[in-house]
């Protein structure tokens, strides 16, 4: 049994439209689940709001990794959770997991986001205040033990 990561999303029940010809959840829905779950954290907890985007800044996904360890089938309950694993001047590294009802690790997601100047369409530094807020969030949601799995993606430390 694995503990969820600090940011927990509401459980999701696998519906018929999420299943494919193999009668299990299609890979598209794993990505969608991860994306929807960490987007809430990104907007609500990390303050990447519509106002921030209107100010000319956002983030773009630079790289993703998904590992599928156990299948989900129709009616199964999925428990998504996330962690802001690392931050530097320009990048964010998130880790997400999907647990099944038995608390077993079913999927691992990692993503690296680059901070973007929407006018130049290029990766740019976070403002000092935003960087400090992100570092503070990461510190207050620190995980004391190592992940029970290897990480595939990495960003440079500050």
Question: What role is predicted for each listed range?
Answer:
Residues 103-105:
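Residue-level signal for glycine
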Residues 65-101:
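Hydrophobic beta-sheet segments that form the core/acyl-binding groove
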Residues 2-61, 117-158:
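Hot-dog-fold acyl-thioester-processing enzymes
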Residues 8, 60-62, 78, 92, ...:
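Hydrophobic core residues within well-ordered beta-strands of beta-rich domains
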